[in-house]
Amino acid sequence: MRKELNFDLFYHFLDVWLPQADRLAKGFEEAKPFPHIVLDDFLPRAGADFILEHFPSPTCRSFGQPDNKFQVRKLGQIQKNYFRGVPQTLRYLLHDFNSMAFVEFIERLTGIRGIIPDPHFHGGAFHQSLPGGHLGIHADFNVDRRRRLLRRVNVLIYFNKHWKSGYGGDLELWDTSLIQCEQRIEPIFNRCVIFETSSNSYHGHPVPIAENAPENRKSLALYYYAADQRAFDPGFAHSTIWKDE
């Protein structure tokens, strides 16, 4: 039986954020180095607390993603094992981010019509970086090859309740020429970052997490797509593009 919760993400998106989408859209569109927005206190406090309380442990058997030179001590790929080890209620909550209320909010905020959520959570869902961990600057893969859809929007929500600026792990947004970082965003609790995804929306958290950080850097990553003829062009699709690759 599904546990009754004292919050409702669907109606929070519908009643709190959807009415603000048109007002926020201009700031999103004009943000540099590429369209993005930072929204604090994004989830109802009870909802954010619940997700943090039940966030999968680093020892969860579904976590994977071995180290390489671009990402170190970063856990992800939990969806590849069908979320085994993740509490049932937490799995149910993921679907609220694929709901009509949230998708319409994303459409109106970004101006991108025909947004399609990802029930497979390919590359997304629960991520965490351990002390010493980092994620190199990169542009994400641009095509869902399984469904032939173009990737358009990333949504990142952070669950780090005691985070301080000295712990590293800031999300960095770089210019399209990969010359410099133009925005640094601290991954503080219940902060949401939404940005338009393209082949030059370079981002990452290259500064390693401090060894004395009292918690792992935890985030929920959600990716959204749209139909586009270019998704059928083998020459257009690419995997992750890493800085200095």
Predicted regions and their residues:
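Fe(II)/2-oxoglutarate
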Residues: 1-32, 238-245
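Catalytic core of Fe(II)/2-oxoglutarate
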Residues: 2-3, 132, 143-151, 160-245
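Non-heme Fe(II)/2-oxoglutarate
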Residues: 9, 16, 25-109
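Histidine-centered active-site/metal-ligand motif
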Residues: 36, 138, 203-205
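Conserved strand-loop elements at the edges of beta-sheets that form or border functional pockets
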Residues: 41, 128, 187
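Non-heme Fe(II) oxygenase catalytic core, chiefly the N-lobe of the double-stranded beta-helix
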Residues: 54-56, 84-89, 94-151
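Proline-centered turn/helix-capping motifs that create local helix->coil transitions or kinks
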Residues: 59-60, 113-116, 161-165
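Eukaryotic charged/polar low-complexity linker/IDR segments
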Residues: 154-156
